[in-house]
Amino acid sequence: WVAMRIPDNAISAHANQARIQQIKFNDPDNCLYAPDVISFAREKGYFNGPDEEFSFCDAYAPADFGTVRGCDARVWAFFRTVADDMDQYTDYAMGYNMSNRMPLWVKPRTKVDPKTVFDAMRDHYEGTPMDMTQDIGAGGHALPYRWRPMEFEVDGVSYVNERATATQQTGFWFVAQARPWLPDDMGILWFGVDDAATSCLTPIYCSATEVPEC
């Protein structure tokens, strides 16, 4: 495992795929890691280069078309809504240029508020080349839903169903909001049941000890 401190003026995101590359071994204030993070990778045959070239995600979760298109593309969709110049990574998000990696974090144009995160969780790649409301699978009603599998073949030709942030098979979703100027008990968990794109969020205080009657 490895953990990186995100700068106070930046945001980061992960979507079921490791993204941390180089580890800052001599910066304990900003980077923590398992003592055997490299030796274990060597033992398992995941890495055989010099320590200074070790990349955590390349060793333990190497990216391919499926992981980039199905996972990192969701990170890209979020980043492009809050930060400038993210369209330069469109070819990476679509799985076409694996060397054009996105940064681990980006500096947003303005402070990110809860509503921005709510909207990001409801995304179907609208306004991008992967817009699920515009391709042939959307039908006549611009339906942004695709039933699995994500990859399929017809008459020897391979096709892809996008894996958007919002999906119909979601059981629940939430956004945690910490407000440092208020007591800890005033922290809020915005909680929703089912598909993020079609469900509402209910604020639940972290001090709650029982479920209220509705």
Locations of regions flagged by a protein language model:
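C-terminus-biased signal that marks the final domain/tail of proteins
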Residues: 1-214
